[in-house]
Amino acid sequence: MILACDVGLKRIGIAALLNGVILPLEAILRQNRNQASRDLSDLLREKNIQVLVVGKPNESYADTNARIEHFIKLVDFKGEIVFINEDNSSIEAYENLEHLGKKNKWLAIKDGRLDSLSACRILERYCQQVLKNH
């Protein structure tokens, strides 16, 4: 199974590829990086993940890239790790919330649903890249 994550300072959005369908999963709410890396490690183990797709912004965001790479090194995972450009994934995910009212949009941002929808966009990009290369 393949899992994607959108690593943020407060939340980690999670999406999985199940039988060819990309689904958002419950986001990991970060209290600190050790707790968050432990929670992600547990999820990877529970779901028997073989490939972890991680969103990273373009090179002009050096601090963010370094923070994401450091966090991923804390994760206990022996499978394949693939970094995919995440530019605009949160904006694209937010556009999928147009049907929600203002209050529900705010809740979707706070509870991590937006982050997991962003992880779905990252996983879509990974799938497109894999298909293009085959």
UniProtKB/Swiss-Prot annotation:
Could be a nuclease involved in processing of the 5'-end of pre-16S rRNA. SMART domains: YqgFc (SM00732). Disulfide bonds: none annotated. This is Putative pre-16S rRNA nuclease. CDD domains: YqgF. It is found in: Cytoplasm. The lineage of its organism: Bacteria, Pseudomonadati, Campylobacterota, Epsilonproteobacteria, Campylobacterales. GO terms for molecular function: nuclease activity. InterPro entries: RNaseH-like_sf (IPR012337), YqgF (IPR005227), YqgF/RNaseH-like_dom (IPR006641), YqgF/RNaseH-like_dom_sf (IPR037027). Signal peptide: none annotated. Belongs to the YqgF nuclease family. It comes from the Bacteria. NCBIfam families: PRK00109.2-2, RNAse_H_YqgF. GO terms for cellular component: cytosol. Keywords: Cytoplasm, Hydrolase, Nuclease, Ribosome biogenesis. GO terms for biological process: rRNA 5'-end processing. Its EC number is 3.1.-.-.
